[in-house]
Amino acid sequence: MKTLSYNIKIYATPERVWDILWGNETYNVWTKFFSCDSQMKSDWKVGGKTYFTDGDGNGMVSTIERIDEPNEIVFKHLGMIKDGQEDFDSEDVKAWAGSLEKYLLVDYNGETQLHVEVDIQPEYEEMMNNGFDQGLAMVKHLAEKLV
């Protein structure tokens, strides 16, 4: 497992950036650089369930390990969902189960420093770098557009 980190300064409040990251209307706009038709469904509870899926409903089953809106959220990835079936036990899943994805938003007088850390398998590094570079640039664009 490898941990990648990303940082971007956004000229908007943490509340605004949080809304862009997790809002129903904007989540799939910035995550399209990872997968077309990306969706996130969550009960927003620590220890609850969060699903990160593609347009076919396939993707990851995760939980929120820590949340302090609008300053921090940490997702723990637990398994996969494919064809409606959740998988927590296959060898593929065991290779990365327990990996974390962290978002930290720090307020500097109305500007936000967004820091992201994600645990990945090395073979996904290029995909993650491309996705986060383009995705976080889109978050910045969306957050600053209406400020």
What does each of the following model-derived ranges do?
Residues 8, 50-53, 59, 63, ...:
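Charge-dense, helix-prone N-terminal extensions
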Residues 3-4, 47, 99-102:
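Short structured motifs
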Residues 33, 38-43, 58-109:
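Hydrophobic-ligand binding "helix-grip"
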Residues 78-82, 117-123:
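Short, solvent-exposed aromatic-acidic interface loops
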Residues 1-39:
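Hydrophobic ligand-binding cavity/cleft-lining segments
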Residues 94-97, 119-147:
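A conserved amphipathic terminal alpha-helix motif
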Residues 17-21, 27, 50, 64, ...:
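Hydrophobic pocket/interface hotspot
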Residues 1, 49, 70-72, 109-113:
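A generic structural signal for beta-strand entry/edge sites
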